[in-house]
Amino acid sequence: MTTTHGSTYEFRSARPGDAEAIEGLDGSFTTSTVFEVDVTGDGFALREVPADPPLVKVFPDDGGSDGEDGAEGEDADSRTFVAVGADGDLAGFAAVSYSAWNQRLTIEDIEVAPGHRGKGIGRVLMRHAADFARERGAGHLWLEVTNVNAPAIHAYRRMGFAFCGLDSALYQGTASEGEHALYMSMPCP
């Protein structure tokens, strides 16, 4: 058990019985700012701008697995870590995978339930991911985040992540069309 901001949580590897709660976790967010992306022939620039009215983002059900097997089907280079509240309910999770060829641990997904945000759960889940990265010999951690998720971008930067790339076409043809994928990385601590 770990106490963060006065609340007690159990942090552990996911179990098969956690799969339904992981799939059903509310990953939506509301933000009053977004990162505007200016793409030029020579690169790109980011600028945080107000979102008025505040943007509410609900991620659509992707209709299947995209490599994030949750608590089921994990291999030696994949893990899902969970945070469980004192009430036994899932408070958050982080699904990660290691790629040996580039010594990268990818944060496939990290979500914290709305009622548990701001309590350090994401930071502790990321520490578990970093521990797993070190076990695997990873040189860095890497993730993708939409430019409209300013709360997550700020959290990742506080954790030590820095911008390392952009994909302006990743979300074309999806419910997130018009958004840009921002890539962030940090050396394995």
Swiss-Prot record:
What Pfam families does the entry give? Answer: Acetyltransf_1 (PF00583)
Q: Which GO terms describe its biological process?
A: response to antibiotic
Which SUPFAM superfamilies does this UniProt record tie to the protein?
A: Acyl-CoA N-acyltransferases (Nat) (SSF55729)
Which keywords accompany this UniProt record?
Answer: Acyltransferase, Antibiotic resistance, Transferase
The protein's Enzyme Commission number: 2.3.-.-
Catalytic reaction(s) noted: streptothricin F + acetyl-CoA = N(beta)-acetylstreptothricin F + CoA + H(+)
Temperature and activity? Stable at 35 degrees Celsius. Rapid inactivation occurs at 50 degrees Celsius.
| Alphabetized InterPro entries for the sequence | Acyl_CoA_acyltransferase, Bact_Acetyltransf, GNAT_dom
Is Acyltransferase among the key words of this record?
A: yes
The UniProt GO MF terms for this protein read: acyltransferase activity, transferring groups other than amino-acyl groups
Which top-level enzyme class is recorded in the Swiss-Prot or TrEMBL entry?
transferase
User: Which residues lie in Acidic residues bias regions?
Assistant: 63-75
Q: Which NCBIfam families match?
A: stat
Q: What is this protein called?
A: Streptothricin acetyltransferase
Supply the gene name. Answer: sta
